[in-house]
């Protein structure tokens, strides 16, 4: 077997990899159905429960939660703080790495992650900055 034929499975995989993440203004189940080649990120909580806000798409097979909040309620214990920065970063990295491992093109909400119900910029600004830097890397806006 010649070297090109031997390397073709690897090369084919590289050439077929989606390039860069994209943003979309709003998600719907129909939109996700129309794009099975993409993985749609949404702001999630540590309990992986609730369907409010971006999590309305939670149960769709092309949706993937990125934890930005402790629980799906409005009490003080539901929100992250920078007191747990290292743990917050670990969860963000774990979720983003799992999304990237799918090999699908990543779709990020135009409004961002951690920007709505999670209130990261107010309650955990260092965590918010870290998450935004990771998202900018995915978008190629370093």
What is each PLM-predicted segment?
Residues 3-142:
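Macrodomain-like recognition of ADP-ribose-binding/processing modules
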